Regions:
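Core catalytic lobe of class I
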Residues: 2-394
Length: 394
């Protein structure tokens, strides 16, 4: 076990099952654990965390403390059930929508043509960028890769086996407590969620949906005018049109927020940038990143899907973790469930996105990561976040 302390963050390179039993009085758990998809063949992603781990998390948290945990759309049920079985109350499901996922779909038409020995017609070529490792491609000018887009005559042309991923669900759970929420908050500081500091677009009540602001996601929502404060609300008699009655009916200090608009109604966070991924990693070497996956030929037959990202390996990078979450997204989630001055635990720290976010928000942090490679990346990113936070205070 390796232990590092960076400001108000304590980081362990260890199995979380060895560290969680020694932790107590934590205010929240915000984490992105294995999804049980064997992503990119990674052994650590073979299965979702079991009841034993979530039981230890439960024991480390204060009564009323919240847990937020990402899972994959296919394995959400396998992730949420052990959390509930460990003793947590499932409070909600949050949804993060994004437009950058690639479909890991098997091209049935191409597979049928291959079985029958049929030739496929080349209908177009597309520039799929650099670093393509497999599939039907040839070298173009400037060492860029040009892929043939083909079409067959089989009745199964256009059929595949999977949809394009565009969301990740997040379990919101809470450790049970006795008595009222008010009493628990007064005693432990936990039990509620921070509505006002997570309001969206100048005052909208936070929803259980977040998005990356991409055009493909924005097109889902109807295009209505953007709404802000609806103005002063002055009620004169009894039960007003906004449900105001009693002493508050003549209070013009209350402002009410509209609920028009489109995607602006929900928290927006762009996908993880290279700057966000690699901030603080100047001293680390560039290594081959993992990610992408699949063969070009399976995905680029659909011209609309030929973005150059499908079926590709990621370019070499300093942060080699394949599932880095945006810091702004993690800051929002940390702020949502953590009381002022609280301490957040992440038993599956990865490259430290939750820790980076917690430090930026002024929270304490305890992170646990079993991979030495990712632990070193997390330490560097969190140390940089600590330096930035320290500069803000002076």
């Amino acid at each position: 076990m390796i232990k590092e302390t960076i400001g108000n963050a304590t980081l362990y390179c260890a199995d979380c099952r060895d560290v969680l039993p020694i932790l107590t009085d934590l205010d929240a758990c915000v984490t992105d654990p294995p999804y049980g998809l064997s992503f990119m063949g990674k052994a650590w992603d073979y299965d979702v965390p079991g009841v034993d781990i979530w039981t230890e998390v439960l024991g480390a948290l204060k009564p009323g403390a919240h847990l937020l945990s990402f899972f994959g759309s296919r394995t959400y049920h396998r992730g949420a059930i052990p959390i509930e079985d460990a003793g947590f109350e499932i409070r909600d499901q949050l949804m993060w929508l994004y437009g950058s996922g690639f479909p890991k779909s098997h091209n049935i038409g191409k597979a049928v043509d291959k079985l029958h020995g049929n030739e496929r017609e080349v209908v177009a070529t597309v520039d799929v960028g650099h670093d393509m490792r497999s599939g039907n491609y040839k070298t173009g000018s400037g060492n860029r890769m040009i892929a043939d887009v083909t079409k067959g005559a089989s009745e199964y042309e256009g059929w595949g086996t999977a949809l394009k991923p565009a969301h990740e669900p997040i379990v919101m759970a809470r450790k049970p407590f006795t008595g009222s929420v008010a009493n628990n908050v007064l005693e432990y500081g936990t039990g509620g969620i921070n509505i006002d500091e997570c309001r969206v677009d100048g005052g909208r009540f936070p929803a259980n949906l977040m998005h990356d602001g991409s055009e493909v996601v924005g097109d889902i929502f109807p295009k209505n005018k953007k709404s802000g404060v609806m103005g002063d609300n002055k009620q004169y008699k009894g039960f007003g049109k906004h449900g105001i009655y009693g002493q508050a009916k003549d209070d013009i200090s209350h402002k009410f927020y509209g609920d028009e608009g489109s995607a602006s109604r929900y928290f927006y966070c762009a996908k993880t940038s290279k700057k966000d991924r690699d901030e603080g990693l100047d001293a680390l070497a560039i290594n081959q990143a993992t990610g992408g996956g699949g063969g070009i030929g399976d995905y680029l037959d659909d011209v609309n899907s030929a973005s150059g990202k499908y079926g590709s390996e990621k370019a070499p990078a300093k942060n080699t973790h394949p599932t880095v979450k945006p810091t702004d997204l993690m800051r929002y989630l940390c702020r949502l469930v953590t009381p002022k001055g609280g301490v957040i635990v992440d038993p599956f720290m990865g490259s430290g996105s939750t820790g980076k976010a917690a430090v930026a928000e002024g929270f304490g942090f305890v992170g646990i990561e079993m991979s030495q490679e990712y632990f070193d990346i997390a330490c560097a990113r969190i140390e940089q976040a600590h330096k930035i936070k320290a500069q803000e205070l002076f």
